[in-house]
């Protein structure tokens, strides 16, 4: 993971008691990543990075929450270029 910033969020204590701090942090990061992806602000890869998940794990979370993929021809071309560079 690259450089980043910490963001402080306030949650009621009972939520922290229910989920625990670690899970609450993971869920908050995931929900932010999903919303940024849904709005088209970040790519799939960047959203997965924000959520601290692999792309495969992030795709699973999108499917679990019925979030459609934002995949256009430009992203397809980028993926084709990356695969071409790997070969």
UniProtKB/Swiss-Prot annotation:
<dbReference type="InterPro" id="IPR005368">
    <property type="entry name" value="UPF0175"/>
</dbReference>
<dbReference type="InterPro" id="IPR052264">
    <property type="entry name" value="UPF0175_domain"/>
</dbReference>
<protein>
    <recommendedName>
        <fullName>UPF0175 protein AF_0597</fullName>
    </recommendedName>
</protein>
<comment type="similarity">
    <text>Belongs to the UPF0175 family.</text>
</comment>
<dbReference type="Pfam" id="PF03683">
    <property type="entry name" value="UPF0175"/>
</dbReference>
């Amino acid at each position: 993971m690259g450089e980043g910033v910490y963001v402080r969020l306030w949650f009621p204590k009972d939520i922290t008691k229910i989920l625990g701090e670690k899970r609450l942090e993971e869920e908050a990061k995931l929900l932010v990543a999903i919303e940024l992806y849904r709005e088209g602000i970040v790519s799939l890869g960047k959203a997965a990075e924000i959520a601290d998940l692999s792309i495969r794990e992030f795709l699973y979370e999108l499917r679990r929450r019925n979030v459609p993929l934002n995949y256009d021809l430009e992203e397809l071309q980028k993926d084709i270029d990356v695969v071409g560079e790997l070969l």
